[in-house]
């Protein structure tokens, strides 16, 4: 059995984030084999992770890896924004997006499986639930990306043009959040909903007006709605005198697609109730 030195305990502590006594105990049990000790601690980390699995992870970070021809967007969630700013979390996210890009993954499932051991160590170390939520890979003639403060990530695929142009359009997408690429992609249902809302809001204004005037008012609103909802019709944020579609055409490009991730989209955040939390802690203490 190898000697359990202070240096060995320190190394295990740095690699796992566990307490000194826990590290010494794990090394003793593993006969001084640090890798075996880590494996054993993963098992205990998995127990801790299971306890955290019910906690809502709605904060986190977006990461991007690209090479001008392909890009991967990745969202990794944490429970608090504080953890998302810590080096351990950042390292996990960076390693995950690098692997996803290198392995040309198009879905999160294989990445989740590959990174599970590292995730469990991170959960055990930080005490927070951490999840790889989603991943997207895009490829094309020209690919440009934009990352806004690790909270919003965008990848734009162009046919023709330049990476710089694609990056400019990606920055616009981050700021303006279009729902569609083209007006023709807006569903009839979405148009009808917009029409119904417009009629409801302007009911008084339309009273007594001829039908043709009402139709023109509706057509004007729908036209504005299509321009607001579709990327190519939006005014470019850097130069509102030109649309994004015209900008692309001027740069000799056609916009093929855009992908936009924002941290926590669609996740219902848990609102903590302090009284309920205290009651739950007291109930748990009684059961121990």
Curated annotation (Swiss-Prot):
Localisation: Cytoplasm
Give the principal location in a single coarse category.
cytoplasm
Using the record for this protein, list the coiled-coil segments as residue ranges, or answer none.
none
Q: Where is this region: Involved in Mg(2+) ion dislocation from EF-Tu?
A: 80-83
SUPFAM superfamilies per UniProt = Elongation factor Ts (EF-Ts), dimerisation domain, UBA-like
A GO molecular-function annotation? translation elongation factor activity
Instruction: List UniProt keywords, sorted A-Z.
Output: Cytoplasm, Elongation factor, Protein biosynthesis
What domain of life is recorded for the organism?
A: Bacteria
Extract one GO cellular component term from the record. cytoplasm
Pfam families given in the database record: EF_TS (PF00889)
Q: Which NCBIfam families match?
A: tsf
What does the sequence similarity comment in the record state about its family? Belongs to the EF-Ts family.
This molecule's function is given as: Associates with the EF-Tu.GDP complex and induces the exchange of GDP to GTP. It remains bound to the aminoacyl-tRNA.EF-Tu.GTP complex up to the GTP hydrolysis stage on the ribosome.
* Name by which UniProt lists this protein: Elongation factor Ts
Gene transcribed to yield this protein = tsf
